[in-house]
UniProtKB/Swiss-Prot annotation:
Matches recorded under Gene3D superfamilies: Vaccinia Virus protein VP39 (3.40.50.150)
Record bears the keyword Transmembrane helix: no
This protein's UniProt keywords: Cytoplasm, Methyltransferase, rRNA processing, S-adenosyl-L-methionine, Transferase
Listed InterPro entries: rRNA_ssu_MeTfrase_G (IPR003682), SAM-dependent_MTases_sf (IPR029063)
Gene name linked to the record: rsmG
Free-text function comment from the UniProt entry: Specifically methylates the N7 position of a guanine in 16S rRNA.
HAMAP family in the cross-refs: 16SrRNA_methyltr_G
Keyword DNA-binding part of the UniProt annotation: no
Name under which the protein is recorded: Ribosomal RNA small subunit methyltransferase G
EC number from the UniProt entry: 2.1.1.-
Location (main, coarse): cytoplasm
Length: 214
């Protein structure tokens, strides 16, 4: 496990020198922060034996980190950017991760595919406001599945603004895990349970959820 984390760090630093996957400012420190933030979920929840889809995986936070630290889970990383998906696949291959796959596709398209209603958990970090991410993530979950949203100090405001989206899409906030990260306080993982089937017309076509949030 620690070998895989070390390999991931080394590959990310190398790739970041060619393509800006994460901020280059104080990269070693920021990298540790991203990893610790991603794995913080495992202090609160057990993903063993679960199917997890990570949306907007980017450079691998939180999905790839969770796959490394939770080999008993099954992870699908969704990312539409070619360079990022190539990087994610390279790390998976180098580390020999058998529990993790990458899919290069837009989230809205996947939400209308055979993968709809098929995951136990959907994770998302630093992608968009909550009312947008709800439309991306809830269609992918089975009934009773949970959407896991990494948020900062304004999470309460985002929850208030997402009330309409929660009602339309069949979700309910059931837990909020708060924690501190290094010198940064007021971090939270907001847990949204899928209580009702999401109407078939959601997610809307590519680009619309972000352009016209519910």
């Amino acid at each position: 496990m620690e070998y895989n984390v070390k390999t991931f760090k080394e590959m990310l630093i190398e790739e970041n020198s060619r393509h800006n996957l994460v901020s280059r400012k104080s990269l070693p420190v920021e990298l540790e922060k991203h990893i610790e933030d991603s794995r913080s979920l495992l202090n609160f929840m057990d993903l063993k034996g679960s199917r997890v889809v990570d949306i907007g995986s980017g450079a691998g936070f939180p999905g790839l980190v969770l796959a490394i630290y939770c080999p008993e889970g099954e992870f699908l990383l969704l990312e539409s950017d070619l360079k990022k998906t190539e990087f994610l696949q390279a790390v998976i291959n180098r580390c020999g991760l058998k529990n993790c796959q990458v899919l290069r596709k837009r989230i809205e398209e996947v939400g209308r595919s055979e993968l709809r209603n098929s995951f136990d958990f959907c994770s998302c970090r630093a992608l968009a406001m909550m009312n947008i991410v709800l439309e991306y993530g809830l269609p992918l979950l089975r009934l009773g599945g949970k959407l896991l949203l990494w948020k900062g100090k304004n999470y309460s405001r985002e929850i208030e603004q997402a009330a309409n989206a929660l009602d339309i899409l069949g979700g309910k906030v059931v837990d909020i895990f708060t924690y501190s990260l290094m010198a940064e306080r007021d971090r939270a993982i907001v847990v949204v349970e899928k209580e009702r089937d999401t109407p078939a017309k959601y997610p809307r076509r590519v680009g619309i959820p972000a352009k016209r949030p519910l």
